[in-house]
């Protein structure tokens, strides 16, 4: 079978044979595998045959390859050759990885079953190579294949199922993230796999999955489906996201209640009566077990707010105020629910009283609060999308804790604990006290969530004031674990104590704000979460606002980004507390600076804050828009249009969605307006002017009120007409569409087109946020703004784009629109109905006008394209075609001429050499009498020109030969048998793109011609005259010809030349770099070495140490870019992994790095030292795993090198030095011998080594 497999391999490689012939041979091999045992010698060859067959683009051949692979693996498992499968799997896994992402379903299914069959013998290899690519890549087909692979592996043998279960648990976060993937098949596959994984697990594991779904913010519908599939009650997920009592007692009002119905006088917020206050106080004083209503009251809100309109500013601008906090019901132990040894505190969230938009910025937390105010004014009622907000409310309603609350038996325990903690927080942080500090900080948090705040509130508050400095000492630690513990303790203090922490709020904010400016990402993020928790729970006064606005103007970028989210919390939480103007002025100034910040991330964050600000104070928002640059205005309008399309960002607490609103909803289907409906649209001019409407102080009629109260559901199932296609932007090349007169913005419409409110006026439903017409161009209508409060109500239109025939400036148009603002008395709430009727009428008219504008615009665009654009496109295409043809013809002609000239020269040279050889041979034959001499003459007759040149090629020096012989001896195992060479898998398969398949010309496919090109290439590389394209041609030859090199010496000559060129500091000549840079040139040199490494591993093995040293030297080049340095480092890692003689690489690297350490290395040497230390550490670790030992002389040299690098001051090098010491200590496995090598046992070195070793053992455990 061995010889037959070799014949089949040659058949598969032969490009001249038909596909049917190859399939026939492969099926014959499959038949033999099914009937006979496979010898071990034939296994590598058969794997190579199957790799060629599976990689084929022909259906018959790759199908036969997959089928043969399945039977081949079954035969090897029957013969118990599992280790052989694991060793040979690297030959075929890269090909299967490529097939995982194929566009054809059949190929992906066959690949999945092949990998499942292979998993029993090569589970770790599949996990490292296949799943890491599929789960971390962006190809949805690869993700889907990996999920299917795990699902199939669960149903296979016990070995495969065990591997699959362990791998799936390791990749559980990625699988959960796939539940929210953009591809629907990936989402479905992830949900099915999670159900399959946990359906038979213990309840504790299922509850861990539930918490993971909550942590990764999986949408409730998907989470309920998964939990129902594994046997958990889906209502558990609902209860953790939103209280059932809250959903019963706090019903979200309909859209009619929020937008159509005028607020009644009874619904207006009024100051509570004395009797109500006394009753509330008396009931709060009664000590009793909390009821369900108490739980709901705490979650829905604990303060009573009101609007003080008497002290408003003269310009109608509302201002900021926070009422005096009132006592809240205590948090009791009955409200703490324990589930699966994890505690969830359902009452540790602040009293929330406003809606929350969906946050778009991932740098900011969801800092808004949920709507829970029962007696709030109608203008601030809950949004109709309350069902969509339920997910965000639930995230704040329950805080999953990883600690257990600590219950006390008496208040004296608090004093004893404080006295016990105090000594450990004195002085500086050391190795002796940092663990105690972390433990006591966690204990403070546990006490906060225990029974102390409820049973002994006075003693507990005293304890908090005494231990608050301890918490901040921990939060300001340099250790990340201590910082996290301190900041989470502050979050718990804020959530549990709420207004009781007001007296210390300025100290808390001052300390946490400093941490927000920390350069460490995890510290700044945790500090941001802490400030969010503080602002959501503690009273916001003028001093707090000053600290937040000061952070918004800080020079630190993190502070400015986070401040945008903090201002949103303040805006949402305090938008009804307006008694003085300083707060709003400060916020407006911060937003104006933020939207024009130099950093794009900050501008984007503040544009979202501007959207929230405009929904509360539209007049101030308009002033900000007028003050910023036109470019900033466009970006704000663009972002606000996207937010208005998002159903979770809509602010429907008033009759408008903010400063701008997109085009009103249209009819369900085009052309449904009947003649009767058209007749009802006719309106007299007297009711069309906004000014006239604003002057009307008479209450609206009963008929109009009836129209207002009609519900306008957003969940209608009526068919919706799809939105019009987006027009080409006016900035497109060759496109200048002129607007018609009748296509001007809506604010230019004549008053006669405004409909009259009456009985026959059809009331169109409000457009749903998911309506496709939301995506239409904003040039058809302005964004209409309506005030979100009762102080400043009136339409405000700002045009987005100026018409080509409009000569007015945007500022002039904005000023005109400011003139038509409706002024309304704050106390005359009946006038509100006029505006609602006007809005309803406008919606009815606008939908008809929009349909007409769409039709006219489409007709005009078609006409313009027919007249101008098609002709211009033809002209441009013609020019580009001519230019491209000229370039291609010149290039191809030059290439063909060069090939013909080389071919003719070689033919003539061969003829002359053959003649000369015949003459010399005849002379030798005449004088020869020995048979051996005649045989030698016959060999010389068969020599060609290429053979003579190869024989006369430059040979490597004696040093090269000596290194090669030493490497061969090193590659032998302990028993004298050669170690198997690892099949090379280039690192670009995982992190970058694979090596490209180079095209080879038909003339170069001849082996004799290829040898000639190789010799010319070696000569040009040695003289540094090889162009960049020449390296690409050389790569193609190396890839195409498996017998390109005559012997190992010729391979060594080319490799040494390439490495010298790569490490050369001086750039090549301008003729070589005529079409590229030095980085491009060296990239091709590196790729040539990688092609040699991949295709000639047997020749390359003796040169591993020298190649690593040369690559380290090449890293010092200042001309290299970051991508090239990364490629070099990946290549070094692959060489070290492939080597079986690590001690040679370690010795070569130590010898090379010695001078750099002694000469006080600079930045480029530091880069080389960092990678060199990593290589030594990697080699020592590999030797420890294989139970190999370093020779004594190399141990001494390595110890001397460690003593030298210990003195280097670089922090990055220090970490690598101690990692090297830890690896050396584990390899030596003798404490005294180790300290003899690295030097005397000093206190500092010993402590640091102990620290790093302890951390490493903890991570491994």
From Swiss-Prot:
It comes from the Eukaryota. HEAT repeats lie at residues 92-130. Its main location: cytoplasm. GO terms for biological process: astral microtubule depolymerization; cell division; mitotic spindle assembly; regulation of microtubule polymerization or depolymerization; regulation of supramolecular fiber organization. Residues 245-293 have a biased composition (Low complexity). It is found in: Cytoplasm, Cytoskeleton; Nucleus; Cytoplasm, Cytoskeleton, Spindle. Residues 804-833, 893-927, 956-971 have a biased composition (Basic and acidic residues). Microtubule binding protein that promotes the stabilization of dynamic microtubules. Required for mitotic spindle formation. This is Protein stu1. It comes from Emericella nidulans (strain FGSC A4 / ATCC 38163 / CBS 112.46 / NRRL 194 / M139) (Aspergillus nidulans). The lineage of its organism: Eukaryota, Fungi, Dikarya, Ascomycota, Pezizomycotina. The gene is stu1.
């Amino acid at each position: 079978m061995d010889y037959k497999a070799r014949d089949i391999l040659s058949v598969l490689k032969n490009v001249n044979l038909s596909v049917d012939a190859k399939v026939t041979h492969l099926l014959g091999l499959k038949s033999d595998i099914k009937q006979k045992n496979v010898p071990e010698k034939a296994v590598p060859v058969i794997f190579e045959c199957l790799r060629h067959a599976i990689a084929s683009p022909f259906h018959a051949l790759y199908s036969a390859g997959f089928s043969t692979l399945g039977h081949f693996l079954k035969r090897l498992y029957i013969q118990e050759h599992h280790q052989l499968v694991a060793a040979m799997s690297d030959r075929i896994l890269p090909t299967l990885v490529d097939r995982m992402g194929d566009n054809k379903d059949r190929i992906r299914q066959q690949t999945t079953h092949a990998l499942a069959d292979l998993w029993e013998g090569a589970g770790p290899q599949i996990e490292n190579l296949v799943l890491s690519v599929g789960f971390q890549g962006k190809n949805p087909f690869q993700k889907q294949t990996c999920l299917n692979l795990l699902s199939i592996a669960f149903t296979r043998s016990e070995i495969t199922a065990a591997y699959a279960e362990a791998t799936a648990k390791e990749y559980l976060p990625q699988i959960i993230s796939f539940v929210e993937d953009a591809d629907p098949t990936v989402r479905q596959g992830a949900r099915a796999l999670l159900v399959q994984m946990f359906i038979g697990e213990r309840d504790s594991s299922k509850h861990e999955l539930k918490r993971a779904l909550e942590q990764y913010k999986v949408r409730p519908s998907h989470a309920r489906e998964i939990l129902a599939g594994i046997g958990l009650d889906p209502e558990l997920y609902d209860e953790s996201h939103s209280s059932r009592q809250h959903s019963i007692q706090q019903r979200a009002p309909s859209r009619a209640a929020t937008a159509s119905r005028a607020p009644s006088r009874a619904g207006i917020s009024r100051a509570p009566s004395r009797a109500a206050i006394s009753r509330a106080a008396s009931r709060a004083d009664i000590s009793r077990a909390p009821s369900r209503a108490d739980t709901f009251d705490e979650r829905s809100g604990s303060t009573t707010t009101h609007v003080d309109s008497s002290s408003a500013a003269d310009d109608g601008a509302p201002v900021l105020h926070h009422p005096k906090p009132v006592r809240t019901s205590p948090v009791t132990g009955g409200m703490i629910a324990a589930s699966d040894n994890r505690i969830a505190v359902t009452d540790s969230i602040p009293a929330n009283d406003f809606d929350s938009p969906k946050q778009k910025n991932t740098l900011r937390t969801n800092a808004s609060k949920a709507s829970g105010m029962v007696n709030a004014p109608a203008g601030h009622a809950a949004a109709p999308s309350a069902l969509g907000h339920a997910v965000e409310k639930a995230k704040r309603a329950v805080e999953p804790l990883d600690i257990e609350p600590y219950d006390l038996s008496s208040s004296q325990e608090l004093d004893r604990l404080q006295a016990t903690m105090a000594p450990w927080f004195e002085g500086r942080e050391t190795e002796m006290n940092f663990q105690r500090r972390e433990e006591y900080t966690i204990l403070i948090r546990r006490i906060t969530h225990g029974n102390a705040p409820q049973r002994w509130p006075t003693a507990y508050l005293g304890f908090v004031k005494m231990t608050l400095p301890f918490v901040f000492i921990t939060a300001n630690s340099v250790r990340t674990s201590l910082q996290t513990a301190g900041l989470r303790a502050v979050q718990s203090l804020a959530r549990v104590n709420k207004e009781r922490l007001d007296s210390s709020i300025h100290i808390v904010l001052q300390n946490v704000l400093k941490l927000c400016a920390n350069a460490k990402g995890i510290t700044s993020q945790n500090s941001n979460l802490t400030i969010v928790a503080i602002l959501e729970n503690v009273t916001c006064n003028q001093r707090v606002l000053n600290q937040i606005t000061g952070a918004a103007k800080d020079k630190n970028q993190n502070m400015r980004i986070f401040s945008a989210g903090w201002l949103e919390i303040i805006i949402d939480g305090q938008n009804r507390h307006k008694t003085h103007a300083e707060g709003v002025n400060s916020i407006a100034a911060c937003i104006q600076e933020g939207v024009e910040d130099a950093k794009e991330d900050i501008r984007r964050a503040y544009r979202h804050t501007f959207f929230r600000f405009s929904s509360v104070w539209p007049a101030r928002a308009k002033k900000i828009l007028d003050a910023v640059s036109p470019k900033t205005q466009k970006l704000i309008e663009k972002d606000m249009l996207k937010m208005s399309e998002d159903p979770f960002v809509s602010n429907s607490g008033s009759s408008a969605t903010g400063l701008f609103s997109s085009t009103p909803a249209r009819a369900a289907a085009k052309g449904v307006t009947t003649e009767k409906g058209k007749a009802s649209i006719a309106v007299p001019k007297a009711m069309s002017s906004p000014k006239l409407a604003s002057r009307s102080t008479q209450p609206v009629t009963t008929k109009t009120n009836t129209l207002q109260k009609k519900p306008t559901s957003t969940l209608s199932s009526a068919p919706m007409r799809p939105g019009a296609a987006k027009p080409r932007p006016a900035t497109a090349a060759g496109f200048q569409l002129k607007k018609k007169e009748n296509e001007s913005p809506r604010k230019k419409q004549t008053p006669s087109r405004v409909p009259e409110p009456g009985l026959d006026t059809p009331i169109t439903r409000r457009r749903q946020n998911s309506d496709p017409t939301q995506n239409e161009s904003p040039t058809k209508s302005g964004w209409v703004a309506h005030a979100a409060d009762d102080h400043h109500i009136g339409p405000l239109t700002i045009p987005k784009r100026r018409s080509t025939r409009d000569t007015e400036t945007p500022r002039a148009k904005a000023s005109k629109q400011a003139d038509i603002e409706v002024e309304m008395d704050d106390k005359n709430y009946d006038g509100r109905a006029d505006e609602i009727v006007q809005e309803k009428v406008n919606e009815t008219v606008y939908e008809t006008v929009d349909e007409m504008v769409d039709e006219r615009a489409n007709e005009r665009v078609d006409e313009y394209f027919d007249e101008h654009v098609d002709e211009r496109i033809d002209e441009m295409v013609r020019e580009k075609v001519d230019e491209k043809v000229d370039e291609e013809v010149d290039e191809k002609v030059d290439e063909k001429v060069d090939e013909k000239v080389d071919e003719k020269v070689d033919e003539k040279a061969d003829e002359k050499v053959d003649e000369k050889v015949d003459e010399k041979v005849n002379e030798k034959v005449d004088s020869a009498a020995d048979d051996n001499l005649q045989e030698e003459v016959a060999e010389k007759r068969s020599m060609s020109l290429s053979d003579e040149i190869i024989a006369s090629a430059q040979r490597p020096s004696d040093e090269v030969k000596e290194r090669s012989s030493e490497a061969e001896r090193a590659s032998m195992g302990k028993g004298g048998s050669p170690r198997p060479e690892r099949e090379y898998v280039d690192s670009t398969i995982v992190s970058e793109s694979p090596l490209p398949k180079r095209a080879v010309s038909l003339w170069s496919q001849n082996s004799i011609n290829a040898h000639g090109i190789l010799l010319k290439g070696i000569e040009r590389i040695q003289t540094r005259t090889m162009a960049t394209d020449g390296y690409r041609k050389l790569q193609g030859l190396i890839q195409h010809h498996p017998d390109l090199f005559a012997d190992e010496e010729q391979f060594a000559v080319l490799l040494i030349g390439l490495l010298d060129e790569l490490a050369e500091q001086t750039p090549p000549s301008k003729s070589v770099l005529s079409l590229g840079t030095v980085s491009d040139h060296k990239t091709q040199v590196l790729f040539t070495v990688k092609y040699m490494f991949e295709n000639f591993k047997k020749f390359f093995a003796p040169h591993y140490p020298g190649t690593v040293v040369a690559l380290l030297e090449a890293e010092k080049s200042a001309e290299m870019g970051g991508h090239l340095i990364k490629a070099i480092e990946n290549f070094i890692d692959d060489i070290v992994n492939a080597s079986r003689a690590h001690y040679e690489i370690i010795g070569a690297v130590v010898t090379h790095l010695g001078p750099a350490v002694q000469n006080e290395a600079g930045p480029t040497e530091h880069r080389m030292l960092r990678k060199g230390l990593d290589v030594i550490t990697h080699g020592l670790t590999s030797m420890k795993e294989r139970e190999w030992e370093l020779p004594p002389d190399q141990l001494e040299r390595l110890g001397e090198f460690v003593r030298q690098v210990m003195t280097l001051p670089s922090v990055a090098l220090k970490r690598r030095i101690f990692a090297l010491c830890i690896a050396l200590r584990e390899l030596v496995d003798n404490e005294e011998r180790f300290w003899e090598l690295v030097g005397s046992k000093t206190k500092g070195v010993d402590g640091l080594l102990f620290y790093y070793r302890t951390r490493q053992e903890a991570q491994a455990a």
